[in-house]
Regions:
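Hydrophobic residues within the alpha-helices of tandem HEAT/HEAT-like
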Residues: 15, 29-35, 71-78, 94-95, ...
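Alpha-helical solenoid scaffolds in large eukaryotic transport, assembly, and signaling factors
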Residues: 2-3, 13-67, 71-84, 114, ...
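Core helices of alpha-solenoid repeat scaffolds
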Residues: 3-9, 42-51, 80-91, 123-139, ...
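Short, polar/flexible loop-turn hinges at active-site or ligand-entry regions and domain interfaces
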Residues: 120-123, 554
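Acidic, serine/threonine- and proline-enriched intrinsically disordered linkers and terminal tails
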Residues: 295-348, 355, 405-427
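Short coil/turn segments at helix-helix junctions and helix-capping linkers
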Residues: 10-24, 52-66, 82, 90-105, ...
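Amphipathic alpha-helical scaffolding segments
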Residues: 29, 296-300, 373-379, 396-402, ...
Length: 984
């Protein structure tokens, strides 16, 4: 501490030097010291430092002054409270100084101190005391109105303090309000504006009494309407209060809105602007309370959206009656912008109206159909707006309308309107021609901002309504090309144009673009070569989509792609070969070339082999390998059967090595690539290549990542079907991992389905060491060995499903295996685990294979209903239901009879019935619906709640089989108050 005090003493001494550079360096060093957490100042050092910093605020050199102010921030947190109060007192006194520079620097100092105080929520005594000390001085400075500059600074600091520490000043709020209200009528507009800001921060923390006083004062003054100037101020103030505390002003809207509506009719553009801004604030901040007035607000906004008394649009409307694909004469398009009138404020009114409509559209989702009837046509008509800033807000409002439409495509539709075909989407569809008519001419305007708005609009429109522009492509393509070719276009405009073109290409039929391919290819190719990487990246995306357009592989096409292949290939290969380019461009060049080879590979000749070698190099690069894997997957899946033999020998081992990388996306992508290679190129793959892949598979088959496991199992299934000889080597670690996964309680859904498909494919290969009985023993062995490996019930279900899958693939083995399972259930020496597996396996096998030939099956399962084990009883119930699905005429009447005649087994039998209803086909079950329905109704009043719940589930599922007949019945029971309805 002593050394720190000595160092600071030296700095303080240098600060008194007559050399400004010495003072500057010493102050800078002091600030560095104060910023250290370790610094501790004794009382004497604190006093000296504070005194010196305050003295330096009056330094003749501005740079020294600025540094001294910066020192105040860290200093406040390092000195004791009374020193902070000394700083604040001095700064407040200096604020009233005659010297303007000292006033300014002291104001900045006060803001710095306030900014460093702990937040109000911390309950800091220092913050409370400092704020109270400042508040009294500020209110008197504001109230005096002697010097406007002092007043403005005081208002600024007051607003800052209220926003940060308003909660600490509750006792001062009445006096703050009293000093602020008179300033709303100040002759200086700057004072009024800062007063409004301060009041906005005040209402965030003031009590109800102060808030009510403020609102009632504003309402009273508005009612008087003494002068237009003050009325404008009061409207602005109400809007500011609404923005900061909308939840509090909501209850006063019934009084406020009629006044604001009245002032809208006064011939004062500035007042109208503020009124509409207030409406916008109410709409955003008081959505519930403003609801009754939304229609009024919309009508006012629609009225003033077209308010342009000094300009006549009639001539322009006549010019727009016909849409020309080649656009209007460029020389005429700047004529609107040449009109200027410095006194014309009407554009601000129109802009406020557009912003308010934007707010209404963004917050009133339930009014979408109404918006498309009234707001949408009005906004479309104003796309011709002459003032660029207003036009941008009109476009933004319509964009908001489109964005609100996208998520409500399936809900928020009036059923009556739907019957008439009047959903928001159909209404938008009918307005597309008007939108295009309004936009197409503006896509060639000189204004970059306007053209960007057009592209954003078209992009959103196509996202909301794919295919909407099918009839209008001839009109729009010239506008897109214009921006791509125009030398005055900014980079952002080109990016927006390319992005728009990409979305349009993706969401329309390729045939729509065939007449325009020649015009589109050249500018897109030029953009691929652009030096700015973002333009190149976006252009490569468009190129990739253009390739799909000129040669659509999904459908036959007569379009001749040959003239364009060279240009598209050349521009892409140049980017693919470049090493010193942005990562995004590298990846998109790979993807684009992948699409070119996939769609046009049969036209590339000798270039194909060279390009595939580049892909091989990119596959070896850690940065580009994932994108290359995806591109190769695309190529391998091409119906053109691209010759990949030149790279498979080196490429497949590289792909195999990716399976051990700790990058999940790379593993998944590689498994997809290998799967498609096995399917389409099995004759080009050697046993060594496949062995290299198989060696990497065991770690991937794990419950830690079920999706990777599923992909690995799907790959093995493909291998079993296409290259069965390769599976002779999987009986070791791979099969062990697969069997281990079958026993996992997490195996379900897609992974379980993949596993079942694999076992069926595996047993059908006829591999000698992987026959039916061997696999069956592998699956069921742990259960019969009474191993502790199976601890979860789900494991038994998974094993049973695998057993059934094997049996379906080898139906000749079925009778013997089913007979063995029946004996296992009957055998008194069988453990509960064996019985559980046997019953579940019988159920799964019987679900797909008719077991009615097994004479004792029914009695064996019914006997299992009496087992002391709840799990065995549940499995027996499931088995009976599942077996019944395999032969409904044989088993369903039996189950229904048992439900009636065996009350003790009723609960389990009803669960069997639920399984039948859930799993059987609708066609198979329909003849029995009435019998089942009547039976269920008889048991709906059962005394046991568990039984009633199962009956209710059965009734609900049964209703879905024949809803037209059964749903009205359920409604009838609901109306009659029948008990069963409460359990549905």
């Amino acid at each position: 501490m002593a050394s720190a005090s000595y160092h600071i003493s030296n700095l303080l001494e240098k600060m008194t030097s007559s050399d400004k550079d010495f003072r500057f360096m010493a102050t800078n060093d002091l600030m560095t010291e104060l910023q250290k957490d370790s610094i501790k100042l004794d009382d004497d050092s604190e006093r000296k430092v504070v005194k010196m910093i305050l003295k330096l605020l009056e330094d003749k050199n501005g740079e020294v002054q600025n540094l001294a102010v910066k020192c105040l921030g860290p200093l406040v947190s390092k000195v004791k409270e009374y020193q902070v109060e000394t700083i604040v007192d001095t700064l407040c006194t200096n604020m009233l100084s005659d010297k303007e520079q000292l006033r300014d620097i002291s104001s900045i100092g006060l803001k710095t101190v306030i900014g460093e105080l702990p937040p109000a929520s911390s309950g800091s005594a220092l913050a409370a005391n400092v704020c109270k000390k400042i508040t009294g001085r500020l209110t008197s400075a504001i109230a005096k109105q002697e010097d406007v500059s002092v007043q403005l600074e005081a208002l600024d600091i007051m607003a800052d303090m209220l926003s940060r520490q308003g909660g600490l000043l509750v006792n001062f709020h009445p006096s703050i309000l009293s000093c602020l209200l008179p300033q709303l009528t100040s002759p200086r507009l700057a004072v009024r504006k800062r007063t409004i800001i301060a009041l906005g921060h005040l209402v965030m923390s003031c009590g109800n009494i102060v808030f009510i006083e403020l609102i009632e004062h504003l309402l009273a003054e508005l009612s008087k309407n003494d002068s237009m100037s003050t009325t404008r101020t009061y409207i602005q103030c109400i809007a500011a209060i609404s923005r900061q505390a909308g939840h509090r002003i909501g209850e006063y809207l019934e009084k406020i809105i009629p006044l604001v509506v009245k002032f809208c009719n006064i011939d004062d553009d500035e007042l109208r602007e503020y009124c509409i801004q207030a409406f916008e604030s109410f709409v955003r901040r008081c959505p519930k309370e403003v609801y009754p007035h939304v229609s009024t607000i919309i009508n006012i906004c629609l009225k003033y959206l077209t308010y342009d008394p000094n300009y006549n649009y009639d001539d322009e409307d006549e010019d727009e009656n016909a849409m020309d694909a080649d656009g209007a004469d460029d020389d005429d398009q700047g004529s609107d912008d040449e009109y200027s009138d410095d006194d014309d404020m009407s554009w601000k009114v129109r802009r406020a109206a557009a912003k308010c409509l934007d707010a209404v559209v963004s917050t009133r989702h339930e009014m979408l159909p109404e918006f498309y009837k009234t707001v949408s046509p009005a906004l479309i008509a104003r796309f011709k707006e002459r003032e660029e800033n207003v036009k941008a807000d009109v476009f933004h409002a319509y964009l908001s309308l489109l964005k609100q439409t996208r998520p409500v495509q399936s809900w928020l539709c009036d059923p009556d309107a739907m019957e008439q075909g009047e959903t928001p989407l159909t209404m938008l569809q009918s307005q597309v021609p008007n939108i295009v008519k309004a936009l197409h001419k503006q896509m060639k305007e000189k204004s970059v901002k306007t053209r960007q708005c057009c592209f954003n609009m078209l992009t959103e429109l196509v996202n909301v309504l794919p295919g909407a522009l099918t009839q209008h492509i001839p009109v729009l393509v010239p506008g897109i090309i214009f921006s791509l070719n125009d030398k005055s276009s900014s980079s952002n405009l080109k990016i927006d144009a390319l992005s728009c073109l990409y979305v349009i290409l993706c969401n329309h039929s390729p045939q729509v673009f065939h007449p325009h391919v020649q015009a589109l290819v050249s500018p897109v190719v030029i953009c691929v070569g652009d030096p700015f990487y973002k333009i190149t990246s976006e252009a490569l995306l468009v190129t990739q989509q253009l390739v799909k357009v000129i040669r659509p592989l999904e459908q036959p096409s007569s379009f001749d792609a040959a003239p364009y292949i060279k240009d598209l290939f050349t521009c892409t290969i140049k980017r693919l070969k470049a090493a010193d380019i942005d990562q995004e461009v590298k990846e998109r060049a790979i993807s684009c070339m992948g699409q070119i080879i996939c769609s046009l590979g049969d036209n590339l000749g000798s270039d194909l082999t060279n390009t595939l070698q580049i892909f091989l190099e990119r596959l070896k690069n850690e940065i580009t390998r994932l994108t290359t894997v995806k591109a190769l997957t695309l190529i391998a899946g091409s119906p053109l059967k691209i010759d990949l033999r030149p790279i498979l020998g080196e490429g497949v081992p590289i792909l195999a090595s990716f399976l051990r990388k700790n990058q999940r996306a790379l593993k998944l992508g590689t498994l997809s690539a290998l799967d498609i290679l096995i399917k389409n190129y099995s004759d080009s793959l050697t046993a060594e290549m496949i062995d290299a892949v198989l060696d990497e598979l065991p770690p991937l088959i794990s419950e830690s990542d079920m999706h990777v496991s599923q992909m690995a199992i799907s790959f093995l299934t493909t291998l079993a079907k296409v290259y069965p000889s390769s599976l002779s080597k999987i009986s070791g670690s791979i099969l062990d991992e697969l069997i281990g996964l079958v026993r996992s309680p997490l195996l379900q859904g897609g992974a379980l389905s993949a596993m079942l498909e694999f076992f069926q494919a595996l047993v059908l290969t006829g591999t000698s060491c992987l026959g039916y009985m061997y696999l069956l023993r592998m699956l069921t062995g742990p259960v019969y060995a009474q191993s502790t490996a199976l601890t979860h019930k789900q494991s038994y279900y998974s094993i049973a499903k695998c057993v059934a899958a094997l049996t379906r693939a080898c139906p000749k083995e079925g009778p013997a295996v089913v007979g063995q399972f029946i004996q296992d259930v009957k055998n008194s020496r069988s453990t509960d685990s064996i019985r559980l597996l046997a019953l579940l396996s019988l159920g799964e096998v019987g679900h797909h294979i008719d077991l009615s030939g097994q004479v004792e099956l029914k009695s064996v399962i019914l006997e299992a209903f009496s087992s002391p084990s709840e799990e065995v009883k549940s499995a027996a119930s499931y088995a009976l239901g599942s077996i019944s699905v395999g032969n409904l005429p044989e088993y369903l009447p039996f189950v229904l009879q048992e439900i009636t005649s065996q009350p003790k087994r009723q609960y389990l039998l009803l669960h069997s019935l639920k399984e039948i209803i859930s799993s059987a086909s609708v066609a198979g079950l329909k003849p029995y619906v009435e019998n089942i329905w009547c039976l269920l109704l008889k048991h709906s009043e059962c005394a046991e709640e568990g039984t009633r719940n199962v009956v209710a589930e059965c009734l609900g599922k049964l209703t879905l089989i024949d809803p037209e007949t059964l749903l009205p019945r359920l409604k009838g029971y609901l109306a009659a108050g029948m008990l069963i309805v409460y359990f549905l």
